[in-house]
Amino acid sequence: MSIAGGLAKTAENVVKMNADTMQIFSRNPRGSSYKTYLPEEIERFQKIRKDHAFGPVLAHAPYTMNLASATEKTYEFACTVIREDIRRMDELQIENLVFHPGSHTGQGAEEGIRLISEMLNEILKPEQTTTVLLETMAGKGTEVGRSFEELAAILERVELKDHMAVSYTHLRAHETSAHL
């Protein structure tokens, strides 16, 4: 859903569609800018959610992040975005933040898995309320998350497992011939 008109307006549009949940982008999906919401906007958004019995809301992190990158600048950018977005989603009372694990860019899936899990151990906090979801990937090129085994390898290394989950994207799993 577009949040161009604000979170409350987006929630109103969801109600008009007879839906009870929504997915938004945490910020510009192809960049790094994000909107700051006034407390009144957040209160209005949460009131609409409560009044219409919304289920959990999902925010998607930008596509431009690569948590498995060997390039320090790219990796640090991704760490900053995830850290900021967890804090922001907690403030907005948005329950879930999903992200693409990234591409290992030739250094190997095992190294990509190590980088992702180390980053998650660094930024996840016991007091956070937002659950972070790893999204299944198609496995094109050097993408990490092409199999449930790769996602499991990341989750096994994360210390705060109760703050983690997997977002299963059927189309991507189908592209890799993954079976449930």
Across the structure, where does each feature detected by a protein language model lie?
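Hydrophobic faces of well-ordered beta-strands that scaffold small-molecule active sites
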Residues: 1, 22-24, 57-61, 97-99, ...
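Cytosolic catalytic cores of cyclic-nucleotide second-messenger enzymes
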Residues: 180
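Alpha-helix capping and helix-coil boundary motifs
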Residues: 6-9, 105-108, 177
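Conserved small/polar residues in nucleotide/adenosyl-binding loops
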Residues: 169-176
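N-terminal pre-domain/capping segments
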Residues: 1-61, 65, 69-84
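Active-site acidic/histidine proton-transfer and metal-coordination neighborhood
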Residues: 67-164
